[in-house]
Amino acid sequence: MADSRATSFGAQAQDYEAGRPEYPFDAVAWMLEILPAGAQRVADVGAGTGKLTRAIAHAPGAQIVAIDPDPAMLAALRENVPGVPTFLGTAESLPLPDDSLDAVVLGQAWHWVDPVRASAEIGRAVRADGTLGLIWNIRDDSVDWVRDLSRIMHRSAAEEEL
């Protein structure tokens, strides 16, 4: 992700936190269930204000760390999910040692990364039998008001980036 876009969310961190939906419990639980036995050390990459971090932090035995390129988003995350270690970084440049993670997860963030570079970097940081988990919330366009909102959003230049 270009540096200017990577750090553009922080100015609106409070609005981002208020406006982004939480991740459904069942989806997060499923993602955690498929982790290798004994897996505990998980990095939430592109963690933002901590929506996914918060959900994983409550999992028994989880040792979550949060990584984001935007210092303001990490500041909001530290308020929202106290006690979680935070690091400046990206999926293409993880600030962690080789083979130090059991899993890397990205919530609504994979579309911001260079998938080839990110895959190689995640492969470096995750142990050989580790896991990459990707999760998104999607809009239910079968609901009239959601469909109308989607049409409005698709007129936005930001939505075209997705």
Regions found by a protein language model. Give the residues of each.
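N-terminal, positively charged/glycine-rich alpha-helical extensions of SAM-dependent methyltransferases
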Residues: 1-11
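Conserved alpha-helix/loop element of class I SAM-dependent methyltransferases that forms part
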Residues: 21-38
